[in-house]
């Protein structure tokens, strides 16, 4: 879908996108703090933990206590650690997040019935770009593990490699399936094209494969073999402490939020709302983005809830699941998507 932009707005677009980008960074960081609180609160309610249940109203002060603890811990570095890799790994992990934010729309506003996506920039291949830069975080994990001079950290990193290689393939195929049916690799076009016909109903198998692969890609339970405490102490992050540990996990939480956005944009209809709301000067500005945020929070709660509902898989089970089950299902969904796309005239 081509967006029609009034001529007098065109010179302002770079400035508007810059401001939107700065706001997005702040919002996503605040969202990551909210995700940390949500996970701690849910886990505390499920397991009757004292901290997040009792510290402040709804456990909100637990975040302050965690921040004080992380900032005041001594910054230790293992003997014979590679300083260059060990000290700079967080740059790759957080850099991956910022690069994803450049092309990820977090909503849209409708002015006089015209749609304006809230994205820093739009690319013809934005969905592939987002998938590509999200994988950069693996370099940060390997830098931590290799630079730590610790065998448990290195084992965790190699487990991460095995998992990422196996699940990036079905993840990429399901993304291509959505793009093939829509006729575009632009994630804004994919979201806009869904209307009332969400891709979760048109491609339920693809949505399932994408969500499972995304869980594995993010390293969430039951796919957290790279940091399984019972086997590897803390895996790749064993030697990280203080704010290094905090920034590493903060990047993972931001990845979880951005992954939830991808599910909502690709399969849950994005920000699409009924036409009369889009044409309303008030609701058209607020409702579409709010509608998308509600879907993102729902996906986020499902991801967090699964952590406390499923056991961790063994690494051989993880590899079998990706190559022997999800990959054939992803290929089957691709055939279905291409056929459906031809039938619908995409």
Swiss-Prot record:
GO biological process: aerobic respiration; methanogenesis; methanol metabolic process
Location (main, coarse): membrane
Membrane topology designation: Multi-pass membrane protein
Catalytic function, reaction form: methanophenazine + reduced coenzyme F420-(gamma-L-Glu)(n) = dihydromethanophenazine + oxidized coenzyme F420-(gamma-L-Glu)(n) + H(+)
Family annotation (Pfam families): NADHdh (PF00146)
GO terms under cellular component: plasma membrane
Gene: fpoH
Cellular localization per UniProt: Cell membrane
Assembly description: The FPO complex is composed of at least 13 different subunits. FpoA, FpoH, FpoJ, FpoK, FpoL, FpoM and FpoN proteins constitute the membrane sector of the complex.
EC number per UniProt: 1.5.98.3
UniProtKB keywords: Cell membrane, Electron transport, Membrane, Methanogenesis, Methanol utilization, Oxidoreductase, Transmembrane, Transmembrane helix, Transport
Reported function: Component of the F(420)H(2) dehydrogenase (FPO complex) which is part of the energy-conserving F(420)H(2):heterodisulfide oxidoreductase system. The membrane-bound electron transfer system of the complex plays an important role in the metabolism of methylotrophic methanogens when the organisms grow on methanol or methylamines. Catalyzes the oxidation of methanophenazine to dihydromethanophenazine. It shuttles electrons from F(420)H(2), via FAD and iron-sulfur (Fe-S) centers, to methanophenazine (an electron carrier in the membrane).
Bilayer-crossing regions: 18-38, 91-111, 125-145, 170-190, 196-216, 257-277, 284-304, 326-346
Organism: Methanosarcina barkeri (strain Fusaro / DSM 804)
PROSITE patterns registered for this protein in UniProt: COMPLEX1_ND1_1 (PS00667)
Protein name: F(420)H(2) dehydrogenase subunit H
Top EC class of this enzyme: oxidoreductase
Family the UniProt entry places it in: Belongs to the complex I subunit 1 family.
């Amino acid at each position: 879908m081509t967006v029609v932009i009034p001529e007098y707005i065109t010179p302002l677009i770079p400035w508007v996108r810059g401001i939107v980008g700065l706001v997005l960074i702040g919002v996503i960081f605040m969202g990551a703090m909210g995700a940390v609180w949500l996970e701690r609160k849910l886990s505390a309610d499920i397991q009757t933990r004292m901290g997040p249940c009792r510290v402040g109203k709804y456990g909100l002060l637990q975040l302050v206590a965690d921040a004080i603890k992380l900032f005041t811990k001594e910054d230790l570095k293992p003997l014979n650690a590679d300083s260059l890799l060990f000290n700079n790994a967080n740059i790759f992990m957080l850099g991956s997040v910022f690069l994803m934010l450049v092309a990820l729309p977090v909503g849209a506003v409708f002015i006089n019935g015209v749609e304006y996506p809230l994205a820093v920039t739009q690319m013809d291949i934005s969905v592939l770009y987002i998938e590509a830069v999200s994988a950069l975080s693996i370099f940060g994990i390997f830098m931590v593990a290799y630079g730590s001079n610790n065998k448990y950290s290195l084992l965790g990193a190699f487990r991460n490699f095995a998992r990422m290689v196996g699940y990036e393939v079905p993840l990429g195929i399901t993304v291509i399936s959505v793009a093939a049916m829509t006729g575009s690799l632009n994630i804004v076009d994919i979201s806009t094209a869904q209307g009332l016909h969400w891709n979760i109903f048109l491609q339920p198998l693809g949505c399932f494969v994408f969500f499972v692969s995304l869980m594995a890609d993010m390293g969430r339970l039951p796919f957290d073999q790279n940091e399984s405490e019972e086997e590897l102490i803390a895996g790749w992050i064993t030697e990280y402490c203080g704010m290094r540990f905090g920034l590493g996990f903060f990047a993972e939480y931001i990845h979880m939020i951005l992954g939830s956005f991808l599910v909502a944009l690709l399969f849950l209809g994005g920000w699409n709302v009924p036409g009369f709301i889009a044409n309303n000067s008030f609701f058209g500005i607020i409702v579409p983005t709010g509608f998308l945020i509600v879907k993102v929070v729902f996906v986020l709660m499902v991801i967090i809830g699964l952590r406390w509902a499923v056991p961790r898989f063994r690494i051989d089970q993880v590899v079998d699941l990706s190559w022997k089950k999800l990959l054939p299902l992803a290929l089957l969904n691709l055939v279905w998507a291409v056929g459906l796309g031809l039938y619908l005239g995409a």
